[in-house]
Protein backbone atom coordinates (compact mmCIF):
# COMPACT_ATOMS: atom_id res chain seq x y z
CA UNK A 1 0.00 0.00 0.00
CA UNK A 2 3.03 2.28 -0.03
CA UNK A 3 2.92 5.30 -2.27
CA UNK A 4 -0.83 5.83 -1.83
CA UNK A 5 -1.97 8.41 0.70
CA UNK A 6 -5.01 7.86 2.93
CA UNK A 7 -7.52 10.15 4.62
CA UNK A 8 -9.78 8.98 7.47
CA UNK A 9 -13.13 10.61 8.19
CA UNK A 10 -13.85 10.47 11.94
CA UNK A 11 -17.16 9.30 13.47
CA UNK A 12 -18.16 12.97 13.83
CA UNK A 13 -18.29 13.22 10.03
CA UNK A 14 -21.68 11.49 10.08
CA UNK A 15 -23.17 14.90 10.99
CA UNK A 16 -22.49 16.13 7.45
CA UNK A 17 -19.78 17.42 5.12
CA UNK A 18 -17.64 20.13 6.73
CA UNK A 19 -14.34 21.38 5.37
CA UNK A 20 -13.28 22.51 8.86
CA UNK A 21 -13.76 19.10 10.49
CA UNK A 22 -10.46 17.72 11.82
CA UNK A 23 -9.38 14.51 10.09
CA UNK A 24 -6.40 12.18 10.15
CA UNK A 25 -4.43 11.65 6.97
CA UNK A 26 -1.45 9.44 6.19
CA UNK A 27 1.28 10.18 3.68
CA UNK A 28 4.79 8.74 3.33
CA UNK A 29 4.30 6.66 6.47
CA UNK A 30 3.45 9.67 8.66
CA UNK A 31 0.08 10.53 10.19
CA UNK A 32 -1.08 14.13 10.53
CA UNK A 33 -4.19 15.86 11.79
CA UNK A 34 -5.71 18.87 10.04
CA UNK A 35 -9.04 20.29 8.89
CA UNK A 36 -10.47 18.39 5.93
CA UNK A 37 -9.96 21.32 3.53
CA UNK A 38 -6.32 21.74 4.57
CA UNK A 39 -5.66 18.01 4.30
CA UNK A 40 -7.06 18.06 0.77
CA UNK A 41 -4.71 20.88 -0.16
CA UNK A 42 -1.67 18.97 1.11
CA UNK A 43 -2.47 15.35 0.31
CA UNK A 44 -0.80 13.85 -2.73
CA UNK A 45 -2.72 11.89 -5.35
CA UNK A 46 -3.56 9.10 -5.63
CA UNK A 47 -5.25 8.80 -2.25
CA UNK A 48 -7.93 6.69 -0.58
CA UNK A 49 -10.84 7.92 1.50
CA UNK A 50 -11.79 5.82 4.54
CA UNK A 51 -15.38 6.20 5.74
CA UNK A 52 -16.28 5.59 9.40
CA UNK A 53 -18.30 2.42 9.85
CA UNK A 54 -20.85 4.50 11.79
CA UNK A 55 -21.92 6.04 8.47
CA UNK A 56 -22.36 2.67 6.78
CA UNK A 57 -24.75 -0.25 7.16
CA UNK A 58 -23.10 -3.59 6.40
CA UNK A 59 -25.15 -6.73 5.87
CA UNK A 60 -24.95 -10.11 4.17
CA UNK A 61 -27.72 -11.23 1.82
CA UNK A 62 -28.61 -14.05 -0.53
CA UNK A 63 -28.83 -12.81 -4.10
CA UNK A 64 -31.21 -14.46 -6.58
CA UNK A 65 -28.62 -14.57 -9.36
CA UNK A 66 -24.88 -14.81 -9.85
CA UNK A 67 -24.85 -13.09 -13.23
CA UNK A 68 -22.91 -9.84 -12.98
CA UNK A 69 -25.32 -7.89 -15.17
CA UNK A 70 -28.26 -8.70 -12.86
CA UNK A 71 -26.54 -8.52 -9.47
CA UNK A 72 -26.75 -4.74 -9.09
CA UNK A 73 -30.38 -4.63 -10.17
CA UNK A 74 -31.28 -7.19 -7.51
CA UNK A 75 -29.46 -5.43 -4.64
CA UNK A 76 -32.24 -3.01 -3.58
CA UNK A 77 -34.77 -5.84 -3.27
CA UNK A 78 -32.32 -8.07 -1.38
CA UNK A 79 -31.32 -5.52 1.30
CA UNK A 80 -34.52 -3.46 1.62
CA UNK A 81 -35.77 -5.32 4.71
CA UNK A 82 -32.40 -4.96 6.49
CA UNK A 83 -32.22 -1.17 6.17
CA UNK A 84 -33.84 1.30 8.52
CA UNK A 85 -33.80 4.03 5.85
CA UNK A 86 -35.48 4.17 2.46
CA UNK A 87 -33.42 2.03 0.10
CA UNK A 88 -33.96 4.61 -2.68
CA UNK A 89 -31.90 7.10 -0.65
CA UNK A 90 -28.99 4.70 -0.18
CA UNK A 91 -25.92 4.04 -2.28
CA UNK A 92 -25.36 0.28 -2.38
CA UNK A 93 -21.95 -1.33 -2.90
CA UNK A 94 -21.57 -5.05 -3.54
CA UNK A 95 -18.81 -6.85 -1.66
CA UNK A 96 -17.34 -10.35 -2.03
CA UNK A 97 -19.16 -13.62 -1.46
CA UNK A 98 -18.88 -15.11 2.02
CA UNK A 99 -18.15 -18.73 2.89
CA UNK A 100 -21.87 -19.50 3.27
CA UNK A 101 -22.70 -18.17 -0.21
CA UNK A 102 -24.14 -14.85 0.87
CA UNK A 103 -22.76 -11.56 -0.45
CA UNK A 104 -21.60 -8.68 1.70
CA UNK A 105 -23.40 -5.42 0.87
CA UNK A 106 -22.66 -1.90 2.12
CA UNK A 107 -25.29 0.85 2.24
CA UNK A 108 -24.52 4.54 2.80
CA UNK A 109 -26.66 7.66 2.52
CA UNK A 110 -26.21 8.85 -1.07
CA UNK A 111 -26.50 12.57 -0.28
CA UNK A 112 -24.05 12.31 2.64
CA UNK A 113 -21.39 10.59 0.54
CA UNK A 114 -21.96 12.92 -2.40
CA UNK A 115 -21.48 15.97 -0.16
CA UNK A 116 -18.07 14.82 1.08
CA UNK A 117 -16.96 13.90 -2.42
CA UNK A 118 -18.12 17.29 -3.68
CA UNK A 119 -15.74 18.99 -1.23
CA UNK A 120 -12.88 16.84 -2.51
CA UNK A 121 -13.75 17.42 -6.15
CA UNK A 122 -14.08 21.14 -5.53
CA UNK A 123 -10.46 21.12 -4.38
CA UNK A 124 -9.43 19.13 -7.46
CA UNK A 125 -8.50 16.12 -5.30
CA UNK A 126 -11.05 13.37 -5.89
CA UNK A 127 -10.11 10.11 -4.11
CA UNK A 128 -9.02 7.09 -6.11
CA UNK A 129 -11.13 4.70 -4.01
CA UNK A 130 -13.62 4.59 -1.11
CA UNK A 131 -13.37 2.15 1.79
CA UNK A 132 -14.95 1.49 5.20
CA UNK A 133 -12.45 1.52 8.07
CA UNK A 134 -13.86 -1.63 9.74
CA UNK A 135 -13.81 -3.48 6.40
CA UNK A 136 -10.02 -3.27 6.12
CA UNK A 137 -9.13 -5.39 9.16
CA UNK A 138 -6.99 -8.43 8.33
CA UNK A 139 -7.18 -12.15 8.93
CA UNK A 140 -9.63 -15.00 9.37
CA UNK A 141 -12.26 -15.05 12.06
CA UNK A 142 -12.97 -11.86 13.98
CA UNK A 143 -10.60 -8.90 14.19
CA UNK A 144 -10.94 -5.94 16.54
CA UNK A 145 -8.95 -2.75 16.23
CA UNK A 146 -8.85 0.24 18.59
CA UNK A 147 -9.14 3.49 16.63
CA UNK A 148 -10.34 6.92 17.74
CA UNK A 149 -11.72 5.80 21.11
CA UNK A 150 -13.76 2.84 19.86
CA UNK A 151 -13.29 -0.73 18.73
CA UNK A 152 -13.72 -1.53 15.04
CA UNK A 153 -15.00 -5.05 14.42
CA UNK A 154 -14.31 -6.83 11.15
CA UNK A 155 -12.57 -9.88 9.75
CA UNK A 156 -13.84 -12.71 7.57
CA UNK A 157 -17.34 -12.69 9.09
CA UNK A 158 -20.33 -10.63 7.99
CA UNK A 159 -20.19 -8.12 10.85
CA UNK A 160 -18.81 -4.60 10.29
CA UNK A 161 -19.41 -2.21 13.18
CA UNK A 162 -17.95 -0.01 15.92
CA UNK A 163 -18.46 -0.78 19.60
CA UNK A 164 -17.24 0.07 23.08
CA UNK A 165 -15.44 -2.28 25.45
CA UNK A 166 -18.67 -2.71 27.39
CA UNK A 167 -20.42 -4.08 24.29
CA UNK A 168 -17.96 -6.87 23.65
CA UNK A 169 -19.41 -9.45 26.09
CA UNK A 170 -22.72 -9.25 24.20
CA UNK A 171 -21.08 -9.55 20.78
CA UNK A 172 -18.41 -12.14 21.58
CA UNK A 173 -20.47 -15.31 21.13
CA UNK A 174 -21.72 -14.22 17.67
CA UNK A 175 -18.22 -13.49 16.34
CA UNK A 176 -16.46 -16.40 14.60
CA UNK A 177 -13.09 -17.57 15.98
CA UNK A 178 -10.25 -16.92 16.12
CA UNK A 179 -10.85 -13.63 17.87
CA UNK A 180 -7.92 -11.20 17.76
CA UNK A 181 -7.48 -7.58 18.77
CA UNK A 182 -4.93 -4.86 17.95
CA UNK A 183 -4.48 -1.76 20.07
CA UNK A 184 -1.94 0.53 21.68
CA UNK A 185 -0.39 -0.72 24.90
CA UNK A 186 -2.33 1.70 27.10
CA UNK A 187 -5.72 0.44 25.89
CA UNK A 188 -7.52 -1.84 28.33
CA UNK A 189 -7.73 -5.42 26.98
CA UNK A 190 -11.05 -7.01 26.06
CA UNK A 191 -12.48 -9.85 28.08
CA UNK A 192 -11.34 -13.20 26.73
CA UNK A 193 -9.34 -11.72 23.85
CA UNK A 194 -5.60 -11.43 23.64
CA UNK A 195 -4.70 -7.92 22.50
CA UNK A 196 -1.63 -7.49 20.32
CA UNK A 197 0.08 -4.22 21.18
CA UNK A 198 0.85 -1.77 18.38
CA UNK A 199 3.93 0.40 18.70
CA UNK A 200 3.22 2.69 15.77
CA UNK A 201 0.41 5.02 14.79
CA UNK A 202 -2.95 3.19 14.41
CA UNK A 203 -3.99 5.13 11.28
CA UNK A 204 -0.69 4.29 9.58
CA UNK A 205 -1.16 0.63 10.54
CA UNK A 206 -4.70 0.51 9.13
CA UNK A 207 -3.65 2.22 5.89
CA UNK A 208 -1.11 -0.57 5.35
CA UNK A 209 -3.66 -3.42 5.63
CA UNK A 210 -5.26 -5.17 2.63
CA UNK A 211 -8.11 -3.12 1.24
CA UNK A 212 -11.73 -4.10 1.66
CA UNK A 213 -14.59 -3.44 -0.73
CA UNK A 214 -14.30 -0.30 -2.85
CA UNK A 215 -17.56 1.65 -2.48
CA UNK A 216 -16.86 3.64 -5.66
CA UNK A 217 -19.43 1.69 -7.65
CA UNK A 218 -22.39 2.50 -9.92
CA UNK A 219 -22.96 6.27 -10.08
CA UNK A 220 -20.01 6.92 -7.77
CA UNK A 221 -17.69 4.88 -9.97
CA UNK A 222 -18.59 7.15 -12.89
CA UNK A 223 -18.16 10.14 -10.59
CA UNK A 224 -14.64 9.08 -9.64
CA UNK A 225 -13.69 8.49 -13.28
CA UNK A 226 -15.05 11.86 -14.37
CA UNK A 227 -13.07 13.52 -11.60
CA UNK A 228 -9.89 11.88 -12.83
CA UNK A 229 -10.58 13.25 -16.32
CA UNK A 230 -11.33 16.73 -15.01
CA UNK A 231 -7.61 17.49 -14.64
CA UNK A 232 -7.21 16.93 -18.39
CA UNK A 233 -10.08 19.20 -19.39
CA UNK A 234 -7.94 22.33 -20.02
CA UNK A 235 -5.61 20.42 -22.34
CA UNK A 236 -8.50 18.67 -24.07
CA UNK A 237 -10.19 22.04 -24.49
CA UNK A 238 -7.10 23.44 -26.22
CA UNK A 239 -6.88 20.39 -28.48
CA UNK A 240 -10.57 20.73 -29.33
CA UNK A 241 -10.16 24.43 -30.07
CA UNK A 242 -7.19 23.70 -32.33
CA UNK A 243 -9.19 21.07 -34.22
CA UNK A 244 -12.11 23.49 -34.70
CA UNK A 245 -9.77 26.21 -35.95
CA UNK A 246 -8.00 23.77 -38.26
CA UNK A 247 -11.33 22.56 -39.62
CA UNK A 248 -12.48 26.14 -40.16
CA UNK A 249 -9.22 27.05 -41.90
CA UNK A 250 -9.59 24.04 -44.21
CA UNK A 251 -13.14 25.03 -45.10
CA UNK A 252 -12.15 28.63 -45.83
CA UNK A 253 -9.19 27.48 -47.91
CA UNK A 254 -11.39 25.07 -49.89
CA UNK A 255 -13.94 27.82 -50.47
CA UNK A 256 -11.23 30.21 -51.70
CA UNK A 257 -9.76 27.59 -54.02
CA UNK A 258 -13.22 26.84 -55.38
CA UNK A 259 -13.83 30.52 -56.09
CA UNK A 260 -10.41 30.83 -57.74
CA UNK A 261 -11.12 27.80 -59.91
CA UNK A 262 -14.53 29.16 -60.91
CA UNK A 263 -12.93 32.49 -61.82
CA UNK A 264 -10.30 30.82 -64.03
CA UNK A 265 -12.98 28.72 -65.68
CA UNK A 266 -15.07 31.82 -66.44
CA UNK A 267 -12.05 33.63 -67.92
CA UNK A 268 -11.15 30.61 -70.06
CA UNK A 269 -14.73 30.39 -71.31
CA UNK A 270 -14.74 34.10 -72.18
CA UNK A 271 -11.49 33.75 -74.12
CA UNK A 272 -12.91 30.73 -75.97
CA UNK A 273 -16.02 32.68 -77.00
CA UNK A 274 -13.81 35.48 -78.32
CA UNK A 275 -11.85 32.98 -80.42
CA UNK A 276 -14.80 30.89 -81.59
CA UNK A 277 -17.92 33.06 -81.57
CA UNK A 278 -19.77 30.55 -83.76
CA UNK A 279 -19.82 28.03 -80.85
CA UNK A 280 -22.93 29.06 -78.94
CA UNK A 281 -23.02 26.07 -76.59
CA UNK A 282 -20.10 25.59 -74.23
CA UNK A 283 -20.33 22.15 -72.64
CA UNK A 284 -16.74 20.98 -72.20
CA UNK A 285 -14.20 23.71 -72.82
CA UNK A 286 -11.14 21.47 -73.02
CA UNK A 287 -12.79 18.90 -75.27
CA UNK A 288 -14.24 21.51 -77.63
CA UNK A 289 -10.94 23.38 -77.90
CA UNK A 290 -9.06 20.12 -78.58
CA UNK A 291 -11.62 19.32 -81.26
CA UNK A 292 -10.96 22.64 -82.98
CA UNK A 293 -7.24 21.87 -82.95
CA UNK A 294 -7.80 18.39 -84.35
CA UNK A 295 -10.17 19.60 -87.07
CA UNK A 296 -7.75 22.24 -88.28
CA UNK A 297 -4.43 20.49 -87.75
CA UNK A 298 -3.91 20.21 -91.53
CA UNK A 299 -5.65 23.39 -92.63
CA UNK A 300 -2.57 25.59 -93.03
CA UNK A 301 -2.75 29.02 -91.43
CA UNK A 302 -5.81 28.25 -89.34
CA UNK A 303 -4.10 25.22 -87.85
CA UNK A 304 -1.06 27.30 -87.05
CA UNK A 305 -3.28 29.92 -85.43
CA UNK A 306 -5.01 27.39 -83.24
CA UNK A 307 -1.68 25.82 -82.31
CA UNK A 308 -0.34 29.15 -81.06
CA UNK A 309 -3.56 29.95 -79.26
CA UNK A 310 -3.63 26.52 -77.67
CA UNK A 311 -0.20 27.16 -76.14
CA UNK A 312 -1.03 30.69 -75.02
CA UNK A 313 -4.57 30.12 -73.73
CA UNK A 314 -3.56 28.55 -70.43
CA UNK A 315 -1.07 31.31 -69.61
CA UNK A 316 -3.43 34.14 -70.55
CA UNK A 317 -6.27 32.47 -68.64
CA UNK A 318 -4.06 32.48 -65.54
CA UNK A 319 -3.98 36.27 -65.51
CA UNK A 320 -7.52 37.20 -64.42
CA UNK A 321 -6.97 40.94 -64.85
CA UNK A 322 -5.90 40.68 -68.52
CA UNK A 323 -8.49 40.87 -71.31
CA UNK A 324 -7.99 40.27 -75.05
CA UNK A 325 -9.61 43.04 -77.11
CA UNK A 326 -8.39 42.17 -80.61
CA UNK A 327 -6.68 39.28 -82.36
CA UNK A 328 -4.79 39.44 -85.70
CA UNK A 329 -3.13 36.45 -87.34
CA UNK A 330 -0.50 36.64 -90.05
CA UNK A 331 -0.04 33.36 -91.89
CA UNK A 332 2.91 34.82 -93.77
CA UNK A 333 4.79 35.68 -90.61
CA UNK A 334 3.32 32.82 -88.60
CA UNK A 335 2.44 34.98 -85.61
CA UNK A 336 -0.59 36.11 -83.64
CA UNK A 337 -0.94 39.74 -82.57
CA UNK A 338 -3.13 40.29 -79.52
CA UNK A 339 -4.35 43.66 -78.34
CA UNK A 340 -4.55 43.17 -74.58
CA UNK A 341 -5.62 45.36 -71.70
CA UNK A 342 -4.33 45.11 -68.12
CA UNK A 343 -4.43 47.20 -64.94
CA UNK A 344 -0.69 48.00 -65.06
CA UNK A 345 2.63 47.64 -66.86
CA UNK A 346 3.82 45.08 -64.30
CA UNK A 347 0.96 42.73 -65.22
CA UNK A 348 1.86 42.94 -68.92
CA UNK A 349 5.51 42.24 -68.18
CA UNK A 350 4.54 39.27 -65.99
CA UNK A 351 2.36 37.92 -68.83
CA UNK A 352 5.21 38.27 -71.32
CA UNK A 353 7.58 36.43 -68.98
CA UNK A 354 5.15 33.56 -68.44
CA UNK A 355 4.55 33.17 -72.16
CA UNK A 356 8.30 33.08 -72.79
CA UNK A 357 8.75 30.47 -70.04
CA UNK A 358 6.15 28.28 -71.78
CA UNK A 359 8.37 28.14 -74.88
CA UNK A 360 6.71 30.81 -77.06
CA UNK A 361 8.46 33.63 -78.88
CA UNK A 362 6.90 36.80 -77.46
CA UNK A 363 7.29 40.47 -78.31
CA UNK A 364 5.63 43.16 -76.23
CA UNK A 365 4.99 46.32 -78.22
CA UNK A 366 4.70 49.82 -76.87
CA UNK A 367 2.06 50.19 -74.17
CA UNK A 368 -0.15 53.18 -73.54
CA UNK A 369 -2.17 54.10 -70.49
CA UNK A 370 -5.87 54.67 -70.92
CA UNK A 371 -7.36 55.89 -67.67
CA UNK A 372 -6.83 53.25 -64.99
CA UNK A 373 -5.73 50.54 -67.44
CA UNK A 374 -2.84 49.92 -69.83
CA UNK A 375 -3.23 48.72 -73.44
CA UNK A 376 -0.46 47.00 -75.43
CA UNK A 377 0.14 44.84 -78.48
CA UNK A 378 1.46 41.36 -77.77
CA UNK A 379 2.95 39.37 -80.67
CA UNK A 380 3.27 35.60 -80.21
CA UNK A 381 5.21 33.36 -82.61
CA UNK A 382 6.84 34.40 -85.83
UniProtKB/Swiss-Prot annotation:
InterPro entries the UniProt entry points to: ATPase_NBD, GspL_cyto_dom, GspL_pp_dom, T2SS_protein-GspL
Pfam families the record matches: GspL_C, T2SSL
Membrane-spanning intervals of the chain: 234-254
GO cellular component, one term: type II protein secretion system complex
UniProt topology in membrane: Single-pass membrane protein
Translocase listed as a keyword: no
Location relative to the cell: Cell inner membrane
Cytoplasmic side: 1-233
Keywords in alphabetical order: Cell inner membrane, Cell membrane, Membrane, Protein transport, Transmembrane, Transmembrane helix, Transport
Quaternary structure (record): Type II secretion system is composed of four main components: the outer membrane complex, the inner membrane complex, the cytoplasmic secretion ATPase and the periplasm-spanning pseudopilus. Forms homodimers. Interacts with XcpZ/GspM. Interacts with XcpR/GspE and XcpS/GspF.
Role according to the record: Inner membrane component of the type II secretion system required for the energy-dependent secretion of extracellular factors such as proteases and toxins from the periplasm. Plays a role in the complex assembly and recruits XcpZ resulting in a stable complex in the inner membrane. Provides thus a link between the energy-providing XcpR protein in the cytoplasm and the rest of the T2SS machinery.
Annotated family: Belongs to the GSP L family.
NCBIfam families (alphabetical): typeII_sec_gspL
Protein name, per record: Type II secretion system protein L
Classification of source organism: Bacteria, Pseudomonadati, Pseudomonadota, Gammaproteobacteria, Pseudomonadales
Amino acid sequence: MSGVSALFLPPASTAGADGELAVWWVQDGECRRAPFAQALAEIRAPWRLYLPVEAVTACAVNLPTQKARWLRQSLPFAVEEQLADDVEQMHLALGPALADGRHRVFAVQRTWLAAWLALAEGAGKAPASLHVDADCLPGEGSCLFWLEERWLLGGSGAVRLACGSEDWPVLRDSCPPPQRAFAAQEVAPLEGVEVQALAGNPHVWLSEQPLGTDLAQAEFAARQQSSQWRRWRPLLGLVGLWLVLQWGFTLVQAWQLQREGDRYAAQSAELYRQLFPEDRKLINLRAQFDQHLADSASSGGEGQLLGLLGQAATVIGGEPTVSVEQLDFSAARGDVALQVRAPGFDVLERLRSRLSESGLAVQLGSASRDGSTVSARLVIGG
